[in-house]
Amino acid sequence: MKYGFAINLHRCIGCRTCTVACKMEHRLSENIQRIRVLNDAGETTYDVPVGEYPNGLSFTWRPVPCQHCDNPVCVEVCPAGATYKREDGIVVVDEEACIGCGQCVAACPYGARQIDPVTPVVQKCSLCFHRLDNGIETTMCQLTCPNRAITVGDLDDPGSDVSKLIAQYGGEQWLAEAGTCPSVYY
């Protein structure tokens, strides 16, 4: 078993329901996001369309959770051993062991980690492993997305919804050239 995401960029409308649901589920501090929604310019603002006025303007949104990489550089650089990869592919932060040094934040090519100034430990998408471990097969971002842009499941199971979507639409890994082998397909 290997958990991962299929995110349909044609369905994402940039509403950030996934971000809000995640904040509420994990009781995150203000300004901490475990999943960011970026526009075409790679920013979290809503005022940067791409194209030419009047008929060619468009917005494309990219939800960016932790990529739960097969080769996670965050695990390699963590001096406390607080970041580790589970057998099911989920990259996890042990908040009790995290020393808040920020080395993993700097190493992540996806910008998927933040240090919470309140706690101060690293925050990142946990793929809602607390839900998955208890038999709830949906993450909060998947459950609440109004356009069903996010699908989570077992990438090793060809019959899973996530694997079927990737097979049907040929999902691409973002920043594949980083060599981390992300488990999120767009």
Predicted feature residues:
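Non-ligating segments of multi-cofactor redox enzymes
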Residues: 1-186
